[in-house]
């Protein structure tokens, strides 16, 4: 148990001035590759703030989604093509994800009809607060299998999941008939370097359940825990493994 100070919602949530477009532009100016921007999703935000205004997480999430939608439209107008809304809470509370979380996730992308825009969501299962820690809570192992069909039926183009820190029963990948899957193959909170052979083997495991054209190789999540040099080593091996296919 712990105590912490949280921002508190005391009135209706509305979008104000843009907060991500300039950040995306500055980073995009450093490369000729299309950069992805990430935004926390409404259901995950509701779990990390206090609330004295809304009568339910669902209704709070609706207004949060509308505010996020305004920012996403600004990003699209600025030229951003890859927009990811992070919803790790879907793995913690899959029933809520099914009841209203996925609906509010779709609401974030309302009226985004440009076919060149990739609508992405990231759903990881929890990590430690320091590198190489092993005793930390994870989301239930069956979470992905509970929400995979609903995600495939949604407007989301690509779903990002973790698999390196804890191997999944990959049967749920069969549920993705049209959705692409960003498949986590590199641990982001472990200093152990995955071998090329290990990554290739796990890709082959996944390809038993999903088409190659739908599978995207990636780390489990962000690389903030890893020292820069170690992160580069892990990514280099991951790319070498991916290029084997």
Predicted regions, residues:
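Domain-level signal for soluble alpha/beta catalytic cores
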Residues: 1-245
């Amino acid at each position: 148990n712990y105590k912490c100070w949280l921002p508190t919602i005391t009135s209706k949530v509305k979008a104000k001035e843009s907060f991500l477009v300039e950040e995306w532009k500055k980073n995009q100016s450093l490369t000729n590759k299309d950069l992805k921007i990430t935004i926390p999703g409404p259901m995950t935000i509701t779990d990390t703030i206090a609330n004295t205004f809304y009568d339910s997480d669902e209704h709070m999430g609706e207004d949060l989604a509308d505010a996020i939608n305004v920012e996403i439209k600004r990003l699209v107008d600025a030229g951003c093509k890859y927009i990811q809304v992070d919803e790790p809470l879907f793995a913690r509370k899959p029933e809520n994800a099914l009841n209203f979380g996925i609906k509010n996730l779709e609401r974030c992308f309302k009226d985004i009809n440009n076919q060149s825009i990739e609508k992405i969501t990231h759903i990881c299962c929890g990590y430690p607060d320091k590198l190489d820690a092993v005793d930390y809570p994870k989301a239930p192992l069956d979470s992905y299998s509970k929400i995979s069909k609903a995600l495939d039926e949604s407007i989301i183009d690509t779903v990002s999941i973790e698999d390196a820190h804890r191997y999944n029963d990959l049967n749920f990948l069969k549920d993705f008939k049209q959705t692409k899957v960003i498949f986590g193959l590199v641990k982001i909170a472990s200093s152990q370097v995955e071998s090329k052979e290990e990554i290739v083997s796990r890709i082959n495991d996944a390809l038993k359940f999903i088409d190659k054209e739908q599978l995207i190789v990636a780390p489990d999540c962000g690389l903030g825990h890893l020292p820069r040099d170690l992160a580069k080593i892990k990514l280099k091996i991951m790319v070498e493994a991916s290029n084997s296919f």
